[in-house]
Curated annotation (Swiss-Prot):
Gene Ontology molecular-function annotations: rRNA binding; structural constituent of ribosome
Cysteines paired by S-S bonds: none
Compartments where found: Plastid, Chloroplast
Self-association and partners: Part of the 30S ribosomal subunit.
Function: One of the primary rRNA binding proteins, it binds directly to 16S rRNA where it nucleates assembly of the head domain of the 30S subunit.
PANTHER family noted in UniProt: RIBOSOMAL PROTEIN S7
Organism annotation: Pelargonium hortorum (Common geranium)
Protein name per the record: Small ribosomal subunit protein uS7cz/uS7cy
GO cellular component terms listed in the entry, alphabetical order: chloroplast; small ribosomal subunit
Keywords tagged on the record: Chloroplast, Plastid, Ribonucleoprotein, Ribosomal protein, RNA-binding, rRNA-binding
Length: 155
């Protein structure tokens, strides 16, 4: 048994412009090869594009997109007597938010388009409408969980 005790919870810092934790989480997921200033540029340009197109607060659109994509249930592989089952598990809110951000960025990267800011803004706007690849990923996960509901007792 470990003698260290429970790990301290890290406080998520806020980004300098919007003063929001979710924006900072998104920036840290956009980040590649330690180029944080580029990640800031990408996100702020995407937010500016959203502001120009929708004439609304881009932060509220971001929150709404994340809320729409956030899953409540996921599937986890579990080996039971030699065979692997996809077991549906409930997800807590913070983990769901992390998954939503990851899915939004994955979908934005796969999108055809000019640059990452354009692709990210388009994906966020589609997610608020209930469309886009991130929403499709959530629905696919829910379908998997529904199909494997019989294995829920293997948790």
């Amino acid at each position: 048994m470990s003698r260290r005790g429970p790990a301290e919870k890290k406080t998520v810092k806020r980004d300098p412009f919007y003063r929001n934790r979710v924006v900072n989480m998104l920036i840290n997921r956009i980040l590649k090869h330690g180029k944080k200033s580029l990640a800031y540029k990408i996100l702020y340009r995407a937010m500016k594009k959203i502001q120009q197109k929708k004439k609304r607060n881009p932060l509220s659109i971001l929150r709404q997109a994340i809320r729409r994509v956030t899953p409540k249930i996921a599937v986890k592989r579990r080996r039971v007597s030699g065979s692997a089952y996809q077991v549906p598990i409930e997800i807590k809110a913070p983990q769901g938010k992390v998954l939503a951000i990851r899915w939004l960025l994955e979908a934005a990267r796969k999108r055809p388009g000019r640059n990452m800011a354009f692709k990210l803004s388009s994906e966020l706007m589609d997610a608020t409408k209930g469309k886009g690849n991130a929403i499709r990923k959530k629905e696919e996960t829910y379908r998997m969980a529904e199909a494997n509901r019989t294995f829920a007792n293997f948790r």
